[in-house]
């Protein structure tokens, strides 16, 4: 009995020593959105949860608004282990894992429930599984929202209204080819340069979720806001694999739990903000219009050859999973 007690006491001492030895870690978490954007609110909630779980040993320093560089620069910094975390749009990952382009296929999901089911299910996990070999670890998907077109020329009510418009797009092949299918002139450009390009009329328009349009004051340089809802956009919570591999299993568990718990909050805040943003944009003088469901269906058909062409370039097993998942989530 005495030996058992001694061993038990020794075990408790080891646990206590491990907790005491748990080193303080500072996590530099960068993103391109402003501090009043729902992505930033997600970072703040993640930070609070992680601090609570780790007893203050794991601290998050947030760097919003491109402070650590644009999305590509931050991606490289994560891969190199210079920066610990970021939350870019999934679109930015298509350059290193081309199958992330599936998430950007136009008119794929009709609502938030379908979007969450697609990303939180087997497809989203299959994409995440491809990242460690690229030096990244993903902790899940946050909401950015449905993307919508703004421009300085006129309302977009039908596909033909996009013809000839110079539209800034994310430097992503699916986005480029989708807008070419609508006979627009897509211009790839880093987000940090966008406001100036709109102001100088170097481009006529751009496409982003409502909350991004409002937060970045694009209404100052864009008169027309059209609810095209052409792509559902998500952010992905990324960790440098070099940093991740330095963490203890307990620290990794805390990070996964904090990210999971922050996700529901971030999505709720983001979707409420999107709804409010429409009214706020109109109050700022933006001219807002919806696109009729029948016209959206027509636009989906116009973009279908783009979808088919890119799908043929991707891993067939993941494309099959994508199509199976779409069939599953679209069932009434």
Explain the meaning of each model-derived region.
Residues 15-18:
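N-terminal signal peptide c-region/cleavage motif recognized by signal peptidases
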Residues 22-114, 122-125, 129-332:
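N-terminal secretory/targeting leader peptides
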Residues 1-10:
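Bacterial N-terminal signal peptides that target proteins for export
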């Amino acid at each position: 009995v005495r030996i058992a007690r001694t061993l038990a006491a020794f075990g408790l001492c080891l646990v206590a020593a491990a907790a005491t030895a748990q080193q303080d870690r500072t996590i530099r978490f960068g993103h391109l959105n402003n501090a009043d954007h729902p992505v930033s609110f997600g970072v703040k909630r993640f930070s609070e949860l992680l601090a609570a779980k780790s007893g203050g040993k794991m601290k998050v320093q947030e760097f919003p608004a491109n402070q650590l560089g644009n999305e590509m620069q931050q991606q490289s910094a994560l891969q190199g282990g210079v920066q610990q975390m970021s939350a870019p749009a999934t679109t930015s990952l298509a350059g290193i894992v081309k199958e992330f382009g599936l998430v950007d296929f136009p008119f794929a999901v009709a609502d938030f429930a379908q979007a969450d089911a697609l990303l939180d299910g087997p497809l989203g996990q299959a994409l995440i599984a491809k990242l460690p070999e690229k030096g990244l670890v993903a902790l899940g998907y946050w909401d950015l929202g449905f993307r919508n077109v703004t421009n300085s020329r006129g309302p977009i009510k039908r596909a033909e209204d996009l013809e000839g418009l110079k539209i800034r797009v994310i430097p992503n092949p699916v986005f480029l080819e989708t807008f070419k299918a609508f006979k627009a002139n897509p211009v790839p450009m880093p987000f940090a340069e966008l406001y100036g390009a709109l102001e100088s009329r170097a481009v006529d328009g751009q496409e982003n979720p409502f909350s991004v349009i409002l937060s970045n004051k694009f209404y100052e340089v864009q008169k027309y806001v059209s609810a095209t809802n052409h792509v559902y956009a998500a952010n992905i919570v990324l960790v440098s694999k070099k940093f991740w591999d330095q963490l203890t299993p307990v620290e990794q568990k805390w990070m996964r739990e904090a990210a999971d718990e922050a996700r529901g909050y971030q999505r709720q805040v983001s979707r409420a903000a999107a709804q409010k943003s429409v009214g706020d944009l109109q109050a700022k003088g933006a001219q807002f219009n919806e696109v009729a469901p029948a016209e959206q269906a027509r636009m989906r058909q116009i973009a279908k050859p783009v979808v088919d062409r890119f799908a043929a370039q991707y891993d067939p097993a993941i494309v099959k999973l994508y199509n199976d998942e779409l069939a599953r989530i679209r069932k009434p």
